[in-house]
């Protein structure tokens, strides 16, 4: 099992974690229903790119 020789400082730990944050999801407005949804995902009422793809 790997064990570190020297303890990592708070600074080095923070530098490593600096890339772990999640960005906000980009939202789009559907052209047909005007509903806000996550990009590249079907809306709640079944529309994608202005076309009905799911019958709910």
Curated annotation (Swiss-Prot):
<protein>
    <recommendedName>
        <fullName>Large ribosomal subunit protein bL32</fullName>
    </recommendedName>
</protein>
<dbReference type="GO" id="GO:0003735">
    <property type="term" value="F:structural constituent of ribosome"/>
</dbReference>
<dbReference type="GO" id="GO:0006412">
    <property type="term" value="P:translation"/>
</dbReference>
<dbReference type="InterPro" id="IPR002677">
    <property type="entry name" value="Ribosomal_bL32"/>
</dbReference>
<feature type="compositionally biased region" description="Basic residues">
    <location>
        <begin position="1"/>
        <end position="16"/>
    </location>
</feature>
<feature type="compositionally biased region" description="Polar residues">
    <location>
        <begin position="25"/>
        <end position="35"/>
    </location>
</feature>
<dbReference type="GO" id="GO:0015934">
    <property type="term" value="C:large ribosomal subunit"/>
</dbReference>
<keyword id="KW-0689">Ribosomal protein</keyword>
<dbReference type="Pfam" id="PF01783">
    <property type="entry name" value="Ribosomal_L32p"/>
</dbReference>
<feature type="region of interest" description="Disordered">
    <location>
        <begin position="1"/>
        <end position="37"/>
    </location>
</feature>
<comment type="similarity">
    <text>Belongs to the bacterial ribosomal protein bL32 family.</text>
</comment>
<keyword id="KW-0687">Ribonucleoprotein</keyword>
<dbReference type="InterPro" id="IPR044957">
    <property type="entry name" value="Ribosomal_bL32_bact"/>
</dbReference>
<dbReference type="InterPro" id="IPR011332">
    <property type="entry name" value="Ribosomal_zn-bd"/>
</dbReference>
């Amino acid at each position: 099992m790997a064990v570190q020789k020297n303890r990592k400082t708070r600074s080095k730990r923070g530098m490593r974690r600096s890339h772990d944050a999640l960005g906000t999801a980009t939202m789009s407005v559907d052209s047909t229903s005007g509903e806000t949804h996550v990009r590249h995902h079907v809306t709640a009422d079944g529309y994608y790119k202005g076309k009905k793809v799911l019958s709910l």
